[in-house]
A protein has these predicted regions:
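Acidic, glycine-rich flexible loop segments
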Residues: 178-222, 227
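SH3/SH3-like beta-barrel superfamily modules
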Residues: 24-27, 50-84
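Short alpha-helix capping/helix-loop boundary micro-motifs
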Residues: 41-46
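Sec/Tat signal peptide C-region and signal peptidase I cleavage site
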Residues: 17-23
Length: 241
């Protein structure tokens, strides 16, 4: 009975936490080189693991206490981290959306242009493989965004990303991006999640981030890091609540 009551209290707390919060991206930054991840949003709560500096995380911030955020990291770690241990790309320049259509979004400022392209999702079952009765692999790559089912006509998949910087142009190809699926329409028929990228740059270091299927069972984060014209990181992970 006691365990049951604890579960009810924790579940109620988490629902309230999500309802009064917002999500953002950042990276771990601590003078000790790592940060403690806690079971609950309290400095007295049990430490469950650690995250090293520069690990990219998504952060759901509690607007009421504004002291902790619920992090999801690319290495699978989920838990609470004290907010001042996360750098939300301070010192980086953020570029904003300037053009949008269902299958193309453009972000730019005076120094850089990032074009993100999508296309109608391929649904040919011959290109997919299952694991434990769920579709898990597309063209032999683990894919994201459909919660184990085949994508239908309501889905798009990333096609390519072009980065233009002064006289330089580089492309993140379809082969590197085709495993990322998302709904073609936004909430109430509005803009889809091509319009929701967070893009930051500092010198020749560019981060391209998004949360696809945000709020749904198939929600996942994607982080692309382009450094000196080359993709040095391409990570995606399921959002765990």
């Amino acid at each position: 009975m006691t365990k049951y009551l604890k579960f009810i209290v924790f579940t109620s707390f988490m629902i309230g936490f999500i309802e009064t919060s917002y999500a953002d991206f950042g990276f771990i930054q601590d003078k000790d080189g790592y940060v403690n991840v806690r079971e609950n949003p309290s400095l007295s709560s049990k430490v469950t693991t650690k995250l090293n500096n520069n690990e990219i995380v998504s952060c759901v911030m509690d607007e009421e206490t504004n002291n902790f955020c619920l992090v999801n990291a690319s290495n699978g770690v989920t838990g609470f981290v004290y907010r001042n241990r996360i750098n939300n790309f301070s010192g980086y320049t953020s570029i904003k959306l300037s053009q949008y259509s269902r299958e193309k979004a453009v972000y730019n400022d005076k120094n850089i242009i990032v074009e993100v392209y999508a296309k109608k999702a391929i649904s040919d079952p011959k290109l997919y493989k299952t694991f434990k009765d769920e579709y898990k692999y597309f063209n032999d790559k683990k894919f994201f965004g459909t919660d184990g089912s085949l994508p239908d006509n309501n889905f798009l998949q990333l096609d390519k990303i072009i980065v233009k910087e002064k006289d330089n142009r580089m492309e993140i190809s379809r082969i590197e991006l085709e495993q990322y699926f998302f709904p073609k329409d936004g909430v109430d028929g509005g803009r889809n999640e091509l319009a929701d990228f967070k893009i930051y740059y500092l010198n020749n270091n560019i981060y391209i981030l998004n949360t696809f299927n945000n709020g749904g069972a198939a929600a996942y984060n994607i982080v692309l890091n382009v450094k000196n014209g080359k993709v040095v990181a391409n990570k995606a992970w399921k959002v765990e609540i």
